[in-house]
């Protein structure tokens, strides 16, 4: 795949942090992308270019870095925005979806009225790793009767198999490692 000069500039700003959050992990730090206004704009513009013709009516941002991309994308698309959060963080009645971790379980919630039947929904997060969190949010969306259009990420860590779990045809990432 040929990468645009803009995405090459974005890739150059993502730094590797070895042994974070634990030994043996190389963390992809996106904060330099966010700190540079030109690079951040390139990212949002690339997301908008990909989704502008898909009639997205709602964008769901996944806690917490997904919020950073979902909000400006929803605004640019003229779509609504909602957020998927960890349990106990949303103030209204919620629906919950549990997903498995390597050692245990976690869950995410949406407000019960955040996504409605018939809406066309895009789920957004910063990084796709194993796909567990995104898959849980996708299940929340479809349980409400909405159409899950796709998942969109800044970065995909392809070696962790998240795209396969979500269904490769439903996954979009600006950058892959």
Swiss-Prot record:
Enzyme class: transferase
Reaction catalysed by this enzyme: AMP + diphosphate = 5-phospho-alpha-D-ribose 1-diphosphate + adenine
Gene Ontology CC annotation, any one: cytoplasm
InterPro entries to which the protein is assigned, alphabetical: Ade_phspho_trans (IPR005764), PRibTrfase_dom (IPR000836), PRTase-like (IPR029057), UPRTase/APRTase (IPR050054)
GO BP terms: adenine salvage; AMP salvage; purine ribonucleoside salvage
Keywords on record: Cytoplasm, Glycosyltransferase, Purine salvage, Transferase
Keyword hit for Glycosyltransferase: yes
Enzyme Commission number(s) of this protein: 2.4.2.7
Pathway: Purine metabolism; AMP biosynthesis via salvage pathway; AMP from adenine: step 1/1
Transferase found in the keyword field: yes
Record's subcellular location: Cytoplasm
Function, in words: Catalyzes a salvage reaction resulting in the formation of AMP, that is energically less costly than de novo synthesis.
Quaternary data: Homodimer.
Similarity comment: family membership: Belongs to the purine/pyrimidine phosphoribosyltransferase family.
Name of the protein in question: Adenine phosphoribosyltransferase
Lineage of the species this protein comes from: Bacteria, Pseudomonadati, Myxococcota, Myxococcia, Myxococcales
């Amino acid at each position: 795949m040929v990468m645009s000069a803009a995405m090459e500039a974005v890739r150059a700003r993502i730094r590797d942090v070895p042994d974070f959050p634990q030994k043996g992990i190389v963390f992809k730090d996106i904060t330099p992308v966010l700190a540079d206004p030109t690079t951040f704009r390139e990212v949002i513009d690339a997301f908008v270019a990909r989704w502008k013709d898909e009639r997205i009516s709602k964008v769901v941002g996944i806690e917490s870095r997904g919020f950073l991309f979902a909000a400006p994308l929803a605004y640019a698309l003229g779509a609504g925005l909602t957020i998927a959060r960890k349990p106990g963080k949303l103030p209204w009645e919620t629906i919950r979806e549990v997903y498995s971790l390597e050692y245990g379980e976690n869950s995410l919630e949406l407000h019960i009225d955040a996504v409605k039947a018939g809406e066309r929904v895009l789920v957004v997060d910063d990084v796709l790793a194993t796909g567990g969190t995104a898959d849980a949010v996708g299940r929340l969306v479809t349980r409400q009767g909405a159409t899950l259009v796709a998942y969109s990420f800044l970065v995909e860590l392809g070696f962790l198999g998240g795209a396969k779990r979500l269904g490769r045809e439903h996954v979009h990432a600006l950058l892959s490692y």
